[in-house]
Amino acid sequence: MSAIALGMIIFAYLCGSISSAILVCRVARLPDPRTHGSGNPGATNVLRIGGRTAAVAVLLFDILKGMLPVWIAYLLHIPPLYLGLTAIAACLGHIYPVFFHFKGGKGVATAFGAIAPIGWDLTGLMTGTWLLTVLLSGYSSLGAIVSALIAPFYVWWFKPQFTFPVAMLSCLILMRHHDNIQRLWRGKEGKIWDKLRKKKQKTPAEEAAELEEKED
């Protein structure tokens, strides 16, 4: 392994360790995603506790921190195996962030960003797979699981030299979704539409406060 490849792997891990969910929530003065909602510092949980704008910001930042290191490594002509390790390092940083006590998210958006530089055709297929699964099922987690399962086959079709690293990345994502898989199997996983409805609905405390104001 060259010094440049090693440097890019370390750089990718450090980029991944920047938890955009935590930072966006701090800037927007929202609850800490690690202690509210599902407890997962990711875009889906931020959607639950902070709404669409904050969730989109987290999603974009998470994609970029996976895409940027891999894109730079690609431009530096780093071999496919080390490109794959760079992608995995970015996801490991997101999952086990050194800046946030090694407690991070599940790495889906970061993995998507890391895979994107392989090709826009692959990126489109991955996006379509996730969207179709979510639209048909209503489960964001199922979209991530199905995408992770199919990703190595897509990559094998378009760029076979990246199949092994992407397969490793998919295994990492599936491992992080172990609890979601169990909840899906038991029928206890929450649908993304329910999260949006709950955000729009007022809490009993808010309704009581409004009644008090009317009485005054």
Curated annotation (Swiss-Prot):
Q: Which GO terms describe its cellular component?
A: plasma membrane
Q: What class of enzyme is it?
A: transferase
What InterPro entries does the entry give?
Answer: G3P_acylTferase_PlsY
Key words of the record: Cell inner membrane, Cell membrane, Lipid biosynthesis, Lipid metabolism, Membrane, Phospholipid biosynthesis, Phospholipid metabolism, Transferase, Transmembrane, Transmembrane helix
Respond yes or no to whether keyword Transferase is given for this record: yes
How is this protein positioned relative to the membrane?
Multi-pass membrane protein
**Any one biological process term the GO annotation gives:** phospholipid biosynthetic process
Q: Which GO terms describe its molecular function?
A: acyl-phosphate glycerol-3-phosphate acyltransferase activity
Q: What is its EC number?
A: 2.3.1.275
Q: Where is the signal peptide?
A: none
- Catalysed reaction per UniProt? an acyl phosphate + sn-glycerol 3-phosphate = a 1-acyl-sn-glycero-3-phosphate + phosphate
Q: Where are the transmembrane segments?
A: 4-24, 56-76, 80-100, 112-132, 138-158
Give the record's subunit note.
Probably interacts with PlsX.
Family per record: Belongs to the PlsY family.
What does this protein do, in the record's words? Catalyzes the transfer of an acyl group from acyl-phosphate (acyl-PO(4)) to glycerol-3-phosphate (G3P) to form lysophosphatidic acid (LPA). This enzyme utilizes acyl-phosphate as fatty acyl donor, but not acyl-CoA or acyl-ACP.
What name appears for this protein in its UniProt entry? Glycerol-3-phosphate acyltransferase
This chain's source organism reads Yersinia pestis
Q: Which gene encodes it?
A: plsY
